[in-house]
Amino acid sequence: MGRIIKPAFTVIGMEGSTADGHGFIPALWETANSRFGEVAALAKTREDGSLCGIWGAMSDMNRSFRPWEEGFTRGLYLAGVEVRDDAQPPQGWVRWDIPGFEYIRVENNAPDGFPRTLKMIAAEGLTLAGAVHDFTDPATGKSYMCFPVRKL
């Protein structure tokens, strides 16, 4: 666990909603992964050419990047890749411009990681400043949950 500062960034991906029913997130990833070639050239890369990040970005239903509503059961999800700021989505893809935040970043390796981190945030007198995002670091293959605690 640690804190990171992430300035505003852009993700292009496949968007879905909890209204789409159980299993919508894996279905989004299946579609995004199978069509990745359509956005690969737009992806933001590091100096070594590796991708900067794969994001499971989340937002409230109004796309204002607030936490999911109704006890974290109602919201939007974007399965995608971090892209250059000037990138435009191909047909069928969606672009989200995610505001900058300070995040508490926790490795996503335990089923109780989400509620446990929410309790820790509350114990420190903090609150969520936005929606939690899933992040996979392509360089290491590790997955993290990013809990925003301060908007930049």
What are these regions (language model features)?
Residues M1-L152:
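A solvent-exposed interaction/effector surface
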